[in-house]
Amino acid sequence: MVLYNGQFKSYDFNNYHKKRQHRKGKNVKKYYDDIFTFDIETTSAWVNEHGNVIKYKRGKSSEYWNSLQPLSICYIWMFGVNDVVYYGRTLESFYEMLGDLPQDGKIIIWVHNLSWEAHFLFNILTGVKMFCRTPHKPMKLTCDDFPNIELRCSYMLTRLSLANWGKSLGVKKLTGDLEYNKIRTPITPLTEKELGYCERDCIVVYEGIKNYLKQYGRQEEIPLTQTGTVRRVVKEKLMEDEAYNKFIKTLVPHNAKEYKMLQHVFAGGYTHANRMHAGKIIRERGEHYDFTSDYPFQLCARKYPFTPWAYIPDKTIPDENTYNDVAYIMELKFTELRCETCNSYIQVVKCSTDSRITRSDNGRVLEASELSITITEQDWLIIKNMYSFKSVEVIKLYKSYKQYLPKPFIEYVLELYGNKTSLKDLEDTLSVELYKKSKEHINALFGMTVTALLQSDIIFDEETLEWKIDKLTESRVNEHLDKLRNFNQREKRYFLSYSWGIYCTAYARVSLFMCLLGSDLINTTVADTSENYKDDVELYADTDSLFLLGSHDFSWYNKWCNDRLIEMCKYHKIDFAKTRPKTKKGKEKPLGYFLREADFIEFRTLGAKRYCERRTDGKLYITISGINKEAVYMLKNDIANFKNDFVFDKDFPTVTKKLPIYISNMPAVTYPDGYKANYKSGVALRPNGYKMHIDDNYSKLIKYAEIESGDLPETFVNSMRGKWV
């Protein structure tokens, strides 16, 4: 790594290309082709109650650290030109270096996690402009000082940590060389080992962007996000057909009100704990089942809304026998609604504000005297098999005729699934790269279908360093929808229907409840059960998986998957074998199957995204949103410690959760080594733990978990948990 001392003033930046801004235009722009990378290392510190600058120390409470003024400072920056990395020690010297770069052409600088670096650059740049979807998270950044320079976030492109990105590239990211709690400033001496760590981060990004150039050719052609990489491929496959271009524009929502309705109807995966077992320590053998690429299966095997949504004046719930060919959105009003199963489905947040919900189950409705909700016909299949009610009234009803998704789209899904299956564990370079690419793309396909058609503007105030969201107005949404609907051939931003994403997750929820309730849910009610009924032995559900007591057979569901795929393949004239590619060992892996994973012998859940299991290998495993798996060691190999109010200590060695603290009003301070800093903006980072707390309402619902079965009548305990049968 080379100390920067004005070398770029005489550097020959002769690696560039020129291209027209428009196909027939005369405006030609120059782009520099060297791969430029940027990274910083920072110190977090705090001003204590005595006015001293201190480093983070273990043993103090979060409340203590929250009471102190946080500080942060950049003590070294690195700037890579291809595989040569330069460095400096102050932000001001980085500003000077930017001024030494060429000014006559576009320069893209890649930054891994730009949201971090940006908050330090605010101290030196003026006229900052950013493209963001959420506050503090810019995807790209420009400024008035150097208008030809664009900083791009490579993390948004990869969604990988530097360590994992480097690993996938065969470039090892050095770890463990920097003591992050040590206070360093621009005058702190750094060892060769520490400098080597700093250099490696830029090298990883350089190798990563070089790899992307194999696909995209030019840096300006690389998409901003991971989803953007697959969006481009799918768009090219679909929009080359002019007839499709015209057709898809007919599916743009009519207006802002329809778009808002569709957004409200959308719901993600079903993640919930069975209230009859929540809180209990289960010491029985059970099975864990998981759908094989669930969303890709739903995209291939099911039919989707293919005509504009049309209002119909009917006031009765449509015949379920039409659901395969017609999509419905219904606004329904229930009276005296009650959940009759061990699991509850209706989300409280999806109900209208005038609903009278009298009892809930961790965010889902158990009882309501009145309830209004807007749902799809797929949601209705689940609700009428789980809830009883005195009456249901159709307030509004819309319909759209269904069809399979376009053949090129389905073929691409199957191609990615085939690559992901057949190339896994192969070691040659081509197979490894294609496997990685296929896995990334197939995971991004669903996200692409539910991307918001229009984002709220994120506004950054350069004077106050504050962020705010400029909410969308109805007129602005209508204006944007009109543009998307423009039949001008060049308008190709809308190439997948937003409704398709809504139905992908709706179908996935139906598949989960088919396996839970033991039928296809058509023409059945809450009173009907089958030999495949699992609701009472299910412990936990998470989007595409179930944890169940006992031994089970889902071959009936897997046959149902086959039948759906056979029908689709027959319609589109696709080889059915593509839905069941073979692994490295020659074993078929059919798309969509519900397959058994590792069994468990102990299990406990405290609600959504919070469960602990002991598998047959004897080890404990935890799944807690925001907490790393290694934190399980705090439980001391005892599942009984996984309980309400248990604290995953922020200072425990295997708890790696961090809390970023965005600072916009840092005071001028003198650090312990005498360095005087007068920066306003930065980000401090400190360890952050997690307390497993159950809210009062949910606690009351499941509080009888610890009572021995003989202490109270079973019917009473069940009724307290909301089961009346």
Residue ranges, per PLM feature:
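N-terminal accessory regions of nucleic-acid-interacting proteins
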Residues: 1-36, 40
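N-terminal G-site helix/loop of the GST-like fold
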Residues: 33, 49-51
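Conserved Walker A/P-loop ATP-binding site and its immediately adjacent core
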Residues: 114-116
